[in-house]
Amino acid sequence: SVAQVSRFLLMFLYSLGEIIPKVRAFAFSNQLGEVTEQFDNFELEIAINQTIHEWGMGSTDYGGALAELERITSSQVDRKTTILILGDARSNYGDPGANSLKRLQEKSKRVIWLNPEPKSFWNTGDSEMQRLSAYCSQVHHCRTLRHLERIISEIARKTV
């Protein structure tokens, strides 16, 4: 489900780095990797193609990805940090990484999860959205530019 909107989500992530200072970007399917340098050093289309080629193949492993994110960023996450996750929360019946997300949430200012699937699909099959949302400040359905605009406006209102 994320494959269909991954380009859109990566364009959003790329654009965030141009607007907000100190954005670190990570991508994953079965492994997590930092793509901040690619986003900083390459034009949009090249950076996105490299990211999809390098990190977008394989079954999603939220447990492994969130554990790796925690390992890599734990010393930098503090009460000023906003963690933004773009994904469908489908665990492929594996570990969804709730414990890692909980620890990251406890150290950060907030965790915002953007899920491209319709809410009616959440918590069906291998979706772990309900379980993972317990450690999120906000959870939103986000599949289009209109959704994204609405969410950004809401986040900005809550930040002021």
Regions found by a protein language model. Give the residues of each.
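Structural motif
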Residues: 80-84, 110
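Von Willebrand factor type A / integrin I
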Residues: 102-160
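Charged helix-capping and loop-helix junction motifs
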Residues: 10, 96-102
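Von Willebrand factor
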Residues: 33-35, 39, 46-81, 118, ...
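Extracytoplasmic/secreted cell-surface and envelope-processing proteins
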Residues: 93-95, 150-151
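An amphipathic, basic-hydrophobic helix/alpha-beta surface used to engage anionic
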Residues: 1-22
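Short acidic, Gly/Ser-rich segments with clustered Asp/Glu that frequently serve as metal-coordination loops
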Residues: 1-7, 32, 90-93
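A short, conserved beta-to-alpha structural element at the edge of catalytic cores
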Residues: 16-38, 106-126
